[in-house]
């Protein structure tokens, strides 16, 4: 069992379901990375400015998985998986 529990936002679940049908390699990479992050979420880069409080990790060069850590609940909430350009435009 992971040191941190985790959950996925509804929008991320929907996106992953679509990715599963179209690009299983990306889906598998994302799911593996989610498990890795739950083991040690502080290993990954914290974001700044408008995205402060979130962290990110790149998946397959072009995609970014964003998440936040709730230390009191020992939970990682995965927020979004988007193309790199889209993530930083959402600010």
Predicted regions, residues:
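A short, surface-exposed loop/turn module that caps and links secondary-structure elements
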Residues: 32-58
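Enriched for short, Lys/Arg-rich terminal
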Residues: 1-6, 17, 24-28, 59-63, ...
């Amino acid at each position: 069992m992971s040191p941190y529990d985790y959950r996925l936002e509804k929008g991320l679940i929907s996106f992953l379901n679509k990715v599963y049908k179209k690009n299983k390699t990306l889906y598998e990479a994302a799911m593996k990375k989610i498990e890795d992050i739950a083991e040690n979420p502080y290993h990954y880069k914290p974001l700044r400015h408008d995205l402060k409080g979130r962290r990110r990790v790149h998946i397959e060069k072009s995609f970014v998985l964003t998440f936040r850590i709730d230390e009191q609940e020992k939970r990682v909430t995965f927020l979004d998986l988007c193309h790199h350009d889209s993530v930083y435009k959402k600010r």
